[in-house]
Amino acid sequence: MSQAISLTFPDGSVRGYDAGATGRDVAESISKSLAKKAVAVAIDGTVRDLSDPVTTGRIEIITRNDDRALELIRHDAAHVMAEAVQELWPGTQVTIGPVIENGFYYDFAKNEPFTLDDLPKIEKKMKEIIARNAAFTKQVWSRDRAKQVFADKGEQYKVELVDAIPEGQDLKIYYQGDWFDLCRGPHMASTGQIGSAFKLLKVAGAYWRGDSNNPMLSRIYGTAFAEQSELDNYLHMLAEAEKRDHRRLGREMDLFHFQEEGPGVVFWHGKGWRVFQTLVAYMRRRLAGDYQEVNAPQVLDKSLWETSGHWGWYRDSMFKVTVAGDDTDDDRVFALKPMNCPGHIQIFKHGLKSYRELPIRLAEFGNVHRYEPSGALHGLMRVRGFTQDDAHIFCTDEQMAAECLKINDLILSVYKDFGFDEVTIKLSTRPDKRVGSDELWDRAESVMMGVLETIQQQSNNIKTGILPGEGAFYGPKFEYTLKDAIGREWQCGTTQVDFNLPERFGAFYIDSNSEKTQPVMIHRAICGSMERFLGILIENFAGHMPLWVSPLQVVVATITSEADAYGLEVAEALREAGLNVETDFRNEKINYKIREHSVTKVPVIIVCGRKEAEERTVNIRRLGSQDQVSMGLDAAVESLALEATPPDIRRKAEARKAKAA
């Protein structure tokens, strides 16, 4: 056969291969050891089965230690789990089983739902199947054959999935031994390549197709890794996350609660609202001088949302509002705002704007409402009503880069104040479906790429990346992702350039040539959802909040009633210094008091007895420590007041002191 295929390898070398050569053939042509390690190939970046014929292009041989192999390991583990379930419980229907972040799941139609007690049995059977080391082989079936085979097996959900596959698209069937499933692929070479580093984690109910009108299925979640050490680290992280669950800590610290009458909306208790307001006050100070804080209505006529495009793009996630009474002269349909941006454009449009006034930066701590399915709600992390620390900058095209850099500096500074030093910034570029001309996108992406390069040069510890095709339909965006104390990543901040809304609403300013010109609109959020950010803080610190954020900073506890008067004096001195203080003069043993306040995560407990009252000292005990530090009252007040000062205020004070010197 002639050498009809040309392959370019990662080192730049080019080799020719016969037409029909597979990925495995290519790996074997390099070395037998590589062929043994290979699990898949990538042609021009697309991962494919080793058994697939290769085509001319850039080729990479993927082994288990390649990052891309992890998805294959998890995908194959999901298939093996499905086979194990059907071996253990014949007649169970398999439906869908995708790879998800940090693992995989599979939904099953079974008369009785799975329980946690079933998971060890399934894991044992999975190990047996993996040990068989059956090859993954692929067949392409006709639509009629696929429907007939699955119908004969009693797999009605698979028949429905076959019907949903577009005409002209291959129906791929993957075998592992005698067991097979409908699947797009790709897969590794055999079940043995999955390895033993897998774990089934939990069971749950899930509606077929996510529709509550459909039957309830039984879902099993699992995870898998290339190495056992990686699995062990992940399971340790899950255990830590369980201890840090903000919902449990929120109850223990008496911060907030949820109840059935208000699904997805927070009932803030006194202490929780104090933390929330501390966060808002901090953000307000960070915006002072650069932003105008505004407030747009929460309820607006649907016509405005039609103009903005939200009614067409986002209506299923919006709350519609009408007047409840029958005898009303206003039968219009309104909506609770899901976003602040249309309201901010109305404020910008109110009155003629000159180029000399730009940039105009409008900020709002706006209450927004978005419908989330009840099954998706998760404490403060996923709610239906929340507060956005939203801002919109209206600027000229020439000002866009400087504004993006200014926003970046603010975002990174805020994160640093809360102890988040590991931040990743990714630029999401144009999606296939978008508004605006290619010329506009070229310009915006060029500017933002330049901003990203500047960020890289200025911040050595900041990771950056590109997310091709992940931009919003109205413009490219930066996404800011934090890494918390146990290694989890949280996407919080965004900076988005918008070509769409200014045009839809006819926003303009008068330029230097006295012409009407459409402004560049930049959306930016730092925390994103303030509620979610607070949930992240609670979990990051495991409830042990920095003193300046803590809702109750100090408890003054006395050993004896003879020290109560002095305890009151200590508490008052701390309050005058600006700290949130409570007293505990109950007739209980001091160790009992300390244990109780430790559960509620009070960061500082000051212990006073007869000796301290006589010497005008205090014993300071920190949350999580068995040690006590004795200090004079005045020194203790000064030290704690400084520690409780927010970092932005402390920086300004230090700058003033340095300037005065």
UniProtKB/Swiss-Prot annotation:
Recorded superkingdom: Bacteria
Every TGS domain range: 1-64
Region Catalytic, annotated ranges: 245-546
Subunit structure comment from the entry: Homodimer.
GO molecular function, one term: threonine-tRNA ligase activity
Cofactor: Zn(2+)
Cofactor note: Binds 1 zinc ion per subunit.
Keyword Chloroplast: no
Reaction catalysed by this enzyme: tRNA(Thr) + L-threonine + ATP = L-threonyl-tRNA(Thr) + AMP + diphosphate + H(+)
GO terms for cellular component: cytosol
BP-aspect Gene Ontology terms: threonyl-tRNA aminoacylation
Keywords per UniProt: Aminoacyl-tRNA synthetase, ATP-binding, Cytoplasm, Ligase, Metal-binding, Nucleotide-binding, Protein biosynthesis, RNA-binding, tRNA-binding, Zinc
HAMAP family: Thr_tRNA_synth
Protein's gene: thrS
Signal sequence region: none
Its job: Catalyzes the attachment of threonine to tRNA(Thr) in a two-step reaction: L-threonine is first activated by ATP to form Thr-AMP and then transferred to the acceptor end of tRNA(Thr). Also edits incorrectly charged L-seryl-tRNA(Thr).
Entry-linked InterPro entries: aa-tRNA-synt_IIb (IPR002314), aa-tRNA-synth_II (IPR006195), aa-tRNA-synth_II/BPL/LPL (IPR045864), Anticodon-bd (IPR004154), Anticodon-bd_dom_sf (IPR036621), Beta-grasp_dom_sf (IPR012675), TGS (IPR004095), TGS-like (IPR012676)
Protein name: Threonine--tRNA ligase
EC code: 6.1.1.3
Entry keyword annotation includes Aminoacyl-tRNA synthetase: yes
